[in-house]
């Protein structure tokens, strides 16, 4: 098709296509734990940040998503017994998040899977070219 020349030169199409492929890849990778990518990132964050306080608003800012999206993920993780909400002692309207024991085990599996995926990317294209590509994509995406 004639449009293919345009598509082959379009960074927007390339990034969108890559995003769809990465979504499919992470869905497959996280299927055993029935997690989506954002839920996996939340578990990994809670694991790495512990014992520091993690608030949903911080997660929303960090992952550049809405508080509603984070709230939905937290509710899902909480329903599966992976995380718990704790009322903020300084502000009863707010709460902190913590991993439950099963959530900690799941977080370790998620971290291992994401780490392996990162190593696979680095092996496929090389560490330096991957970092260069990330810088380019971030510059196209604009200021964070």
Language-model segments: residues:
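N-terminal leader segment of winged-helix/HTH proteins
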Residues: 1-33, 80
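N-terminal positioning helix adjacent to the helix-turn-helix/winged-helix DNA-binding module
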Residues: 11, 38-41, 55, 102, ...
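A cross-family signal for key residues in well-ordered alpha-helices
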Residues: 16, 44, 134
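Alpha-helical linker/hinge and terminal dimerization helices associated
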Residues: 18, 22, 29, 63, ...
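N-terminal helix-turn-helix DNA-binding core of bacterial DNA-binding proteins
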Residues: 20, 24-66
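Short, hydrophobic-biased segments on the C-terminal half of alpha helices
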Residues: 56, 74-75
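Charged, amphipathic alpha-helical coiled-coil/dimerization segments
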Residues: 75-135
């Amino acid at each position: 098709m004639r449009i293919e020349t345009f598509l082959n030169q379009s960074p927007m199409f390339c990034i969108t296509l890559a995003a769809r492929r990465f979504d499919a890849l992470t869905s497959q990778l996280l299927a055993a734990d029935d997690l989506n990518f954002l839920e996996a990132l939340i578990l990994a964050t809670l694991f790495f940040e512990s014992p520091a306080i993690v608030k949903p608003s911080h997660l929303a800012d960090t992952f550049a998503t809405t508080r509603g999206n984070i709230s939905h993920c937290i509710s899902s993780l909480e329903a599966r017994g992976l995380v718990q909400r704790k009322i903020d002692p300084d502000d009863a309207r707010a709460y902190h998040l913590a991993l439950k024991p099963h959530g900690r085990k799941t977080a370790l599996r998620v971290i291992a899977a994401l780490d392996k995926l990162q190593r696979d990317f680095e092996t496929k294209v090389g560490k330096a070219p991957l970092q260069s590509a990330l810088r380019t994509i971030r510059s196209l995406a604009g200021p964070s």
